[in-house]
């Protein structure tokens, strides 16, 4: 039987819940289940070869952007359409990457903590803000990198929420944190590359590239605003 094959009682309880044999009676049981599931994942990770763990966390970071992180995708696209000049885009993406890497690390070690219910609406507002700036200003403003850095701190907390839920084994903490962050960066890079290819395919004449900026930004901002309002209801 399954019970006999479980070396840890928590594994049996988790399995029974997932099979629908046990139900949540209150929030405490739900919280205990989540904690047990996290401990189970950590036990399984500890038993894996190091390279396999690295692969799993790079994959998890990438998938947190593509296909799961539509909010982060829209934010990165907002940066892309803010300036189709490589230098300006590079400065913004670097500021965003540096910022979210800082808060991701701080949150992972427990120095920074903010409820996801607070972080998510602010992330949605960051999408709206970037889209609004794209629409109102022809050129990127001088303070834009600082604003993007601030928003990156928020997005890092969003990344950390998933990582904290997933669990990090203590003996591989730093390497797996870096692996997850690498996956996130690869996801962002993939978004930018795909966007660049599509824009080049749609608008062969480089002089027409700015024609996409305002309509694309309005669409991005509208989705961000909808999500923000929805998160408050």
For every predicted segment, state its role.
Residues 1-63:
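N-terminal soluble domains immediately following signal/targeting peptides that reside
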Residues 60, 64-233:
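Hydrophobic alpha-helical transmembrane segments in multi-pass membrane proteins
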């Amino acid at each position: 039987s399954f019970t006999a094959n479980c070396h840890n009682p928590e594994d049996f309880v988790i399995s029974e819940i997932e099979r629908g044999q046990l139900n949540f009676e209150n929030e405490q049981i739900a919280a205990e289940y989540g904690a047990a599931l996290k401990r189970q994942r950590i036990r399984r990770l500890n038993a894996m070869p190091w390279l396999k763990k690295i692969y799993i966390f790079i994959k998890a970071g990438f998938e947190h952007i593509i296909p799961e992180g539509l909010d982060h995708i829209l934010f990165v696209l907002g940066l892309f359409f803010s300036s189709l000049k490589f230098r300006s885009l590079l400065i913004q993406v670097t500021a965003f990457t540096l910022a979210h890497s800082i808060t991701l690390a701080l949150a992972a070690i427990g120095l920074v903590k903010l409820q996801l219910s607070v972080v998510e609406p602010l992330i949605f507002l960051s999408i709206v803000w970037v889209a609004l700036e794209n629409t109102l200003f022809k050129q990127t403003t001088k303070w834009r990198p600082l604003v993007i850095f601030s928003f990156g701190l928020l997005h890092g907390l969003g990344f950390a929420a998933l990582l904290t839920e997933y669990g990090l084994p203590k003996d591989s903490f730093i390497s797996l944190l870096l692996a997850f962050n690498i996956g996130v960066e690869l996801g962002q890079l993939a978004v930018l590359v795909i966007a660049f290819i599509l824009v080049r395919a749609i608008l062969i004449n480089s002089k027409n590239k700015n024609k996409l900026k305002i309509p694309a930004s309005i669409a991005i901002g509208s989705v961000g605003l909808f999500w923000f309002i929805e998160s408050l209801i």
